[in-house]
Amino acid sequence: SIRNLIKCVQGAGIQMDALVLEPLASGEAVLTDIEREMGVVLVDIGGGTTDVAIFIEGSIWHTMVLPTGGEQLTNDIAVGLRTPFNTAEELKIKYGHAMPATIGPDDLLKVNVFGEDGQQHVSRQFLAEIIEARAEEILELILKEIKRSGYDGLLPAGMVLCGGTAELAGMRDLARNILGLPARIGQPQNLRGLVDTLQSPAFATSVGLLQWGIKHDLPHSAPQPE
């Protein structure tokens, strides 16, 4: 698959100067030097996968890719509420929460659903229960992977969450409860200009790749004419 990716990029007339492991790029953007040195687990919850990377003594010591991510959350919502996928994604982003216990049962949402009725009222708490179930599964897989790696108990800096799913309300608290580690949301650091636009955990990898290129003084490349 890497060969296919390289061919694709070269086919667009772009010279590839280096390949960078995704957790290394994300870590470049969101981790502090102290976290890397002390011991931290970086969790990047993407659309279809979740990348887990353990940093100790300033270096990456263990990586793992889990075959689940934010799209599974959206799919669970679509199935549970019998609503189209795009509606489920919108509900997740606008009203989603990973801690249903913090939401009142009377908080209702009007949802487009399949069938003759077209719409129905759904409690936001029920939406959160659907999200919590899948989020717990992802976090428990991460905990299992940390224990399997042998670095359990060696991560005093805790966990840093990034990726679009990290922006989900309650995700940090749920992660802290399940893993028993300090947790924070990783936002890209050392930015100038359009900070409000890029300072989101969803842009961790993109910003990190740019910072990696600057740090390692990679040559600039531009599209080549056909």
Tell where the protein language model's regions lie, with residue ranges.
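Extended, low-charge hydrophobic alpha-helical regions
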Residues: L155, P188-Q189
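Residue-level signature of catalytic and energy-coupling elements of molecular machines
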Residues: V9, D44, I77, I142, ...
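Glycine-rich phosphate-binding loops at beta-strand->alpha-helix junctions
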Residues: H97-M99, L154-I178
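Feature representing long, continuous alpha-helical segments
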Residues: N75, Q125, E129, A133-E140, ...
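Acidic-glycine-rich active-site phosphate/pyrophosphate-binding loop
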Residues: I45-T49, A53, R176-P188
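Glycine-rich phosphate-binding loop of actin/hexokinase-like ATP-binding domains
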Residues: M38-G80
